Amino acid sequence: PVQAGQEPGNVERSVRRQLETLHEAGKSSEQNVEFIWRHLGHDDRSIRYAARVALEFQEPALWQKRVLSESYPELLITAAVAMARPGDAVMQKNIVDRLLKIQFSGLSEFQKLEWLRALSLVFIRMEAPTVLQQRAVAQILEPEFPSNREMLDRELAGMLVYVNSTKVIDKTLKLMTETPDAGGEAEIPEVLARNAVYGGSIANMLANMPNLNQTPYAYVLRNMKYGWTLEQRRLY
């Protein structure tokens, strides 16, 4: 029999609960920051989340400079989210510089999504990107798009539009034309055949439906105000 202290996940739950005790004001200390920092890059997402929230309750003076010297990607990305939430514009350039030094191509798909989220939060909460920052982000992400990963491609398209990439329109339109429609078509005729009254009308409606997998890209491109050609507009 498994002892109570040996249950799977028991250690992780204990760590998470310790971190959650720091989710309130008035508990700032160097000792707490050290404990939190050890878990910001944890493999368990719930522990990373608990550590990040705990860090946000610590006095910024105890940890913000430490973020700028951090080299471990997962830890840096998580800490950057915590840093972005208060919205201190003074630190925007420093944290953007640190995020852009991470080798994006070497990250896992999940880490890339977290990186994009962190950078988005920095731009939204702290300060919008400068022209130079826009160009730097585009230079990193353009070779990565498309990635043939649906969720990642949607986020990449959104960021590239946000930074006014000169290549995102062509790449996204091409991706839209090549993206297959959502699945489920194989079962539809059989289902419609069961009802002679409504089947025909529904079949006509489905035949004229837009490609649902194209919709997120069309939605993102609506924000692209510059760089369109007449042919691109027509295709869009």
Locations of the language-model features?
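Extracellular/periplasmic ectodomains of large secreted or surface enzymes and adhesion receptors
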Residues: 1-236
